[in-house]
Amino acid sequence: EIQSIFIEHKGNYAYRRIHLELRNRGYLVNHKRVQGLMKVLNLQAKMRQKRKYSSHKGDVGKKAENLIQGQFEGSKTMEQCYTDVTEFAIPASTQKLYLSPVLDGFNSEIIAYNLSTSPNLEQVQTMLEQAFTEKHYENTILHSDQGWQYQHDSYHRFLESKGIQASMSRKGNSQDNGMMESFFGILKSEMFYGYEKTFKSLNQLEQAIVDYIDYYNNKRIKVKLKGLSPVQYRTKSFG
């Protein structure tokens, strides 16, 4: 069963999540026992790599204070949200692909995202409109880095029109946007790094990212969510 879970999740589950998934399936076994069996079976989860893309271009517009201050997890949905942009490059294409998501700090769910060959304002605007569909939000924070898109007047106008507070990381402090950094690290280590040459086109890569986000939201369990996926955790918390 351990080997089956490991293969099903493409080598991305280390012993802690395999232990939780076994528990979800009705198996009562100690996590150290799982760790030992994985060593015997030579099952080792993939290591994450660091990402390199940055949209920071200096002081080009309006900034915001860091309202998060390292307290990443919200106590309810849509209380603390996070956004950023990451870049994908493959040998098969001269163009790059850019992913711009919004993550809910309550359960680490990706509530909206946009994929584009250009990290422009239109991409961010489309993502915002997809994520924040209500007329008004009470006590919602959207945290980002100091990328030029997030300093732009149109970004701040949209947030103000919805009652959303803008929050920004300190310059050069990626850990200030830790939840978003963590998601990008998980995403790339589990479906991109080492697979770059397998993608024959940007369309194929785009579909793989769409499929992965669906898997991440609905199926991939997290230790901090008590062995549930983000959607399962939200559903269980609020019925």
Report the location of each language-model feature.
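An active-site-proximal beta-strand-loop segment
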Residues: 70-111, 117-119
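Active-site beta-loop-alpha junctions of metal-dependent nucleic acid enzymes
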Residues: 95, 113-135
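Conserved, non-catalytic sequence blocks in retroelement Pol enzymes and Pol-derived host proteins
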Residues: 11, 27, 72-73, 92, ...
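Short small-residue beta-strand/loop micro-motif enriched in glycine and branched aliphatics
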Residues: 107-113, 167-169, 193-195
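RNase H-like two-metal-ion nuclease catalytic core shared by retroviral integrases
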Residues: 54-58, 144-146, 152-153, 166-188, ...
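Mobile genetic element proteins and their domesticated derivatives, centered on retroelements
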Residues: 2, 18, 34, 38, ...
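C-terminal domain-tail junction helix/linker
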Residues: 153, 160-164, 188-239
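Basic, flexible linker segments flanking DNA-binding modules
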Residues: 1-76, 173, 229-237
